[in-house]
Structures are given as structure tokens and as C-alpha cells.
Amino acid sequence: MHYPTALLFLILANGAQAFRICAFNAQRLTLAKVAREQVMDTLVRILARCDIMVLQEVVDSSGSAIPLLLRELNRFDGSGPYSTLSSPQLGRSTYMETYVYFYRSHKTQVLSSYVYNDEDDVFAREPFVAQFSLPSNVLPSLVLVPLHTTPKAVEKELNALYDVFLEVSQHWQSKDVILLGDFNADCASLTKKRLDKLELRTEPGFHWVIADGEDTTVRASTHCTYDRVVLHGERCRSLLHTAAAFDFPTSFQLTEEEALNISDHYPVEVELKLSQAHSVQPLSLTVLLLLSLLSPQLCPAA
């Protein structure tokens, strides 16, 4: 391949983009917690990795923690403004939690959302379902279903999550769904034998992309795959590039004690490679300029 042709190929290939979706149990996130400088700094750095992040275990009753966190995130990250979408407070007693989506609003928008109607009261914190747009012609939208199970009813809640999937896929006429969150799906909360009997494991089409055995906990004394991401849909799966827990203590050089001030969980992440979507994107001015400079070499005179 001639040099100009190779350069042109690289220019066009670089028009592709990755899209990262994350879930993080932020462990009793309150205003007092985010007001601590190291906690705020670390949370902002974690959030800035993601195009969509769903935070779990937000227990702030003041209503001020998320706006403060959003303000600092937008000050930190220069790749475009973030917005948030919060569920109502969810729970059965005085202890209530909120699911909060942070998303880069120049890359994705909320198309619709609702709290799952848990008529049988199976879930301690019913899923807060949201449909997001994606910058892709192959997969223009995607449904996210977050769930933070209670350890005492993991198996029951995860079996009910299959019913949520059925309702959601019918509601939006889409099979492209990601189930994600702190499922507590390991160790004492759910044995491997019981895990493998879940409908989300036995029914075809569900891909558990955080591998069994991958540690999603901060403490050195634990090794549990509590946090999960489950993909469904051929289009969604075809775009999958990577999936992993993010070991933020190692990446940010934190001691275990410092990391536990943030959370006892790692975030879990999936990266969709939208380059495989073959979406048509407008060429930047830089690319157009380079093409004009290369044109005499690409099309030599006869």
C-alpha cells in the first residue's frame, strides 16, 4: 500500500469511536461523602471514563450531592457536558436508594425512562429503566436496566429480572438490552450452582460479559463477582469491544483504606466499538484539509 493511501485509510478509520457504559455501587453516597475532597476527586475521575454511568446506592436525602458531583464533573472533563437522570427514592422502609445516570449529553440522550412496576414487591429497589440514543446507524438506541439486589433475596430478584427484560423488550420493541449493576451474584449471596439455574443463564441470548471469578470488590480479603453486566441482542453484542471491572485503587494509586473511602466495589464497564456500526459521520475540517493535500498523490495526472 502506498504511503498516501495508507494515511487516508488511517484517517477514515480514526473516525470511529468507542462508547463506554458503566455501573458503580458508590456505597452509601451522601452529601457529606462527596464533600470530602479525595472522594470527590476520585468519583469525578471514575465518572469521566464513561459515556453513561449508572450510580447505585445513592442515599442522599438532601438532594444536593448529585448536583454538586455533576458540577465538579463538568469542570473536570473537557470532552463535553454531562447531564443526569435520577430515579425516585426506592425502598421498602426508611432506608431508600436512588439510581442515577450520568451521561455525556453531546453523545447520547435519554429517549424515555420509567421505574418498573413491581406489583408483587419482589425487588427491594425496582429497576429504573432508561432508553438512550447511540451515535450509531446499526444500533441507534439501547435500553439499560440497572438493579441493585438485596443480599437476602438475590436469586428471587435475579429471576424476576428476566421478567423485567421481557416487559422492557416488548415495551420498546427491542431486544438490545443491557442489564447491569450490583447483583450480589457470587460468594455467600449466590452459589455458582444456583447462579447457573437462573433464567438469565439458561435462556439463550444473554451474555454475562463480566466473567465468573472476576473480582469486583476492593478489599483484599474478598474475591467476589458481585457486579455484573449482561448483554442481550445481536446488534448490541456485535458492537462489544471490551468488558471488565475497573480497578480504580491500582489505577489511581490508592491504598485499600483510601479506596474504601470511595466504595468497597469496583465499577464494571463495557465498551461498545461503534466503528463496527459503519455509521456515516461527517468528516472534520482537519480530515478534509488532509484529503485536499493528498489528492494530487492519490489521483496522479495521466
From Swiss-Prot:
GO molecular function: deoxyribonuclease I activity; DNA binding; DNA nuclease activity
UniProt xrefs under Gene3D superfamilies: Endonuclease/exonuclease/phosphatase
Keywords: Disulfide bond, Endonuclease, Endoplasmic reticulum, Glycoprotein, Hydrolase, Nuclease, Signal
Enzyme kind, highest EC tier: hydrolase
Nuclease as UniProt keyword: yes
Active site positions, chain numbering: 97, 148
Subcellular location as annotated: Endoplasmic reticulum
Coiled coil: none
Name this protein carries in UniProt: Deoxyribonuclease-1-like 1
Gene name as annotated: DNASE1L1
